[in-house]
């Protein structure tokens, strides 16, 4: 069963993980170098042992594929995954005249009074991003995040490389190539990035008329992050298979530092007590010639009947 791949990762780290400190000072149980394999012909690997919001996954992936780096598109689709990174740029700017938002990520979790103030300020910010083109251009853009690296990698000569278009062309015209790789990891950007790319590099492989994808993820939050990553790259594989006239093969997920945060241990144990349900099916309401023309409404999952959401704090 598809989901057992993920549940076995949780079990393995609970039983064998190393206690480690981390950037967020939360503490983790961690292992290094873990691989999962998902046969996409068996269904779509959206977890059923807890609800995973597919709407957020597809709008974020399509945002990446459009080469967009401004959160306005996400906000238009009620997706707030990247809000904090843009909000941080705003509250640290000279133009911001509101209440002190220093260390808002930590304070919003530990100070209920501050959290209410933070929510008001962030809502004002996102509304202004949606309504004000000039403000959005200045404070909604996140710079060299995934969309930029995938679609407009900056070279030393000042040109850009569209890695997604290049890899689709290679799959169509040279499917035996071992160079069908997209990288988001740019050593030059790492020191200045708010969060260097976690899903760093992925590679495609064609055999027997099927397209497979392997992701190398340098760092993976097992409870909150990895379920998103699995579904996102499975969807990417499906989209590129459609664009190249291939069936889907496997999604192979290789993780460097795979970790469970210490404040997620109870949630992981609760999830492991649940019985997986049948995997949903991915359906396309409309198929486009170009992978870059899809909108969230074109893609749905059918037969998704998950167990309820399990809430957990985000490590900041």
Curated annotation (Swiss-Prot):
Cellular compartments per GO CC: cytosol
User: Which example biological process does GO assign this protein?
Assistant: dTMP biosynthetic process
Q: Give the positions the UniProt entry annotates as the active site.
A: 198
Q: What is this protein called?
A: Thymidylate synthase
Record carries keyword Iron: no
A GO MF term: thymidylate synthase activity
Q: How does it assemble?
A: Homodimer.
What is this protein's function?
Catalyzes the reductive methylation of 2'-deoxyuridine-5'-monophosphate (dUMP) to 2'-deoxythymidine-5'-monophosphate (dTMP) while utilizing 5,10-methylenetetrahydrofolate (mTHF) as the methyl donor and reductant in the reaction, yielding dihydrofolate (DHF) as a by-product. This enzymatic reaction provides an intracellular de novo source of dTMP, an essential precursor for DNA biosynthesis.
Record organism: Pediococcus pentosaceus (strain ATCC 25745 / CCUG 21536 / LMG 10740 / 183-1w)
The text of the family note is: Belongs to the thymidylate synthase family. Bacterial-type ThyA subfamily.
UniProtKB keywords: Cytoplasm, Methyltransferase, Nucleotide biosynthesis, Transferase
Q: Which PANTHER family match?
A: THYMIDYLATE SYNTHASE, THYMIDYLATE SYNTHASE 1
**Its principal location?**
cytoplasm
Pathway in which this enzyme or protein is active: Pyrimidine metabolism; dTTP biosynthesis
- Enzyme Commission numbers on file: 2.1.1.45
Q: Which SUPFAM superfamilies match?
A: Thymidylate synthase/dCMP hydroxymethylase
Q: Which reaction does it catalyse?
A: dUMP + (6R)-5,10-methylene-5,6,7,8-tetrahydrofolate = 7,8-dihydrofolate + dTMP
**Positions contributing to dUMP binding:** 23, 178-179, 218-221, 229, 259-261
UniProt-annotated binding residues for (6R)-5,10-methylene-5,6,7,8-tetrahydrofolate? 221, 315
- One Pfam match, given by its short name, reads Thymidylat_synt
